[in-house]
Amino acid sequence: MKTANCPSCGAMLTFRSAVSILTVCNYCKSTLIRHDLALENVGKMAELLPDPSPIQIGAEGIYRKTRFTVVGRIQLRYGQGLWNEWHVLFENQRSGWLGETLGNYTITSLIQPPEPLPAFPELRAGQNLTLRGRAFQITNIETAHCIAGEGELPIRVGAGYDAPVVDLQATSNVFATLDYSEAPPLVFIGEQVRFDDLKLTRLREALPAGWEPDAGIKAQSFQCPGCGSALTVRAKGYTETLACGACGSIIDITDANFRILSKFKTQVTHEPIIPLGAHGTLENAEYETISYLRRAATVEDVDYEWSEYLLLNRTQGFRWLVEYNGHWSLVQTTTEPAQVTGYGAQGRAFHQGRNYQHFQTAKAKISYVLGEFYWRVKVGERCEISDYIDPPRQLSLERTSKEIIWSLANYVEPDLIKAAFRLEQSLPVRSGVAPNQPSPYTAQRPKFRRLLWLFLGLLIIGQIATLALSSDQRVHQQTFVFDAAAKDKALTSEPFAVSGRDSNLFIRAETNLDNNWIYLDLALIERETGASYAISREINYYQGVDEGEKWSEGDAGDEAALSDIPAGIYYLSVEGELPPSSPTVTCTFTLFRDVPSWINFFLALLGLLIAPLLLSWRARAFEGARWAESDYGPSGKGEPEEDND
């Protein structure tokens, strides 16, 4: 650490980092270039634009178990709004950068260019580059404009200089920036980080005057230069443009005179379900609704339109709340690109350990805007959107000529939206199935599976017990001879005893039929009470030789069952009917008591399978309704590949 006095005002200056070559005096705002111990005053530094960043010089944090201190900042403006690069000094004296853009944070360090890089005009969004043997994808190409700097910095900066920059992403949240303001380009590599993971302390306690501490949003009112309507800016420092709902003017908020950038005309005025300025708590963070837009896409001459609400939290940044046909999703951009494989129905996107299936690709345009936006929004602005789903998540890729943006959406139940924003009016009724709507039947499968195994186990145990307890006792056997010419066709068996609990009684008949039939009327009669259990059976058996091949039809034997027969003394009454010219037929009847049966087991098993089969059918119907809206529905390009996972 070195100290020196400001040559302009005499204030004490401290250089904490050995690589710092520039400092801005905190008192007189002189820009001072360091030449060993001498300081050269190169003029006044421009004023920083006020913003709601919670970070300030002197803030401390931890990254990968190493402490760091914020010692300087460069503030830039690019197409998406304000961008802060905080110069940080680690306790091991290593220098790095904490990037802050729209609530997204990165930690990067300057490295030597690993290989010659393409010229800036040659680069395109979506193009792949290899840095240090790792594959990166270009996600954004911008020319940023420096607003001002503060604190100590390792490079010379000043208001107004242009910085052509290229952002690149790789897997595992690895992030890189190419700065073409110098030759050869400066290369910064690091990773995306979460604000909470940095464990930052000594943050800005007092926000600029008028900012609300809870939401971190300042409300500023002015009159629309197009129609005079009262307008409110809730996110100054983030907001680039504001759309007036009264006249359709899109206003440049960064301009002191609130210059009108464009106007749009619409015959339909949309009223947001969630009012602008409404606060709501989602995923344990409080957000304020600052804008609303409508997007539209036309697929096979069918128009689809949906609503998007822009939410802001001071530390968590921006989120999008998307509503389509009464379905809601909370969306966050991600700096980690997905690995895309296959095309069409076989298209897959792998991201952070999850496998997403391609759902649809369409060209969308902004059809209506209201409120404030962090970029220069314009009605008619177009992009191509590809959606991949793994309910309840949806991974989306938005592509323009200058950038590609990956975002992750989580399905949110409408009741949670209504409660989060304390809405009194009813929300739109859900229609159809959303791409990332979780199937209620899929969620029930584990429960049904557990119950199925439980009842199947009980059923098997019950059947085993039935088999073990059944006596399968032969109680009587007797042979009868039936004559077609006999006048008295009724025959009666000798009495026999049936003992034990109420149970079944099987009657088995074995005959000497050969190319013949017999019709039997059987009656099991209890001798004391006269209780009768009747049953009729027909037995037939035919055989022969046809063109040298033997054939047969029917069976010479038969079996019938009577259920719930109580104990007692019984006899069997049998009456047989034969063809008029039939020879005599011998029939032996054998009666078995308490015979183990499988019929009830299989009927119960069939009953058990009805519920899961019904569940599976309803789950397939639900998925069919989901995919009917995709590129692979009835009017789409084909059927999606079935996922058996």
Which residues are covered by each model-predicted region?
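Mixed-charge, low-complexity intrinsically disordered regions
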Residues: 1-503, 578-645
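Intrinsic-disorder/low-complexity, polar/charged segments enriched in Ser/Thr/Lys/Arg/Asp/Glu/Gln
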Residues: 490-493, 502-506, 534, 557-559, ...
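Low-complexity, Ser/Thr/Pro-rich intrinsically disordered linker/stalk segments at domain junctions
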Residues: 86, 309, 546-547, 559-569, ...
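Beta-sandwich interaction modules
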Residues: 491, 495-497, 545-566
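Hydrophobic beta-strand segments within beta-rich accessory/binding domains
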Residues: 498-515, 520, 562, 567-577, ...
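A mature extracytoplasmic/lumenal domain signature
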Residues: 74, 293, 511-513, 524-526, ...
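Surface-exposed beta-strand/loop patches in noncatalytic accessory domains
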Residues: 517-554
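Envelope-exposed proteins and targeting segments
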Residues: 2, 220, 307, 518-520, ...
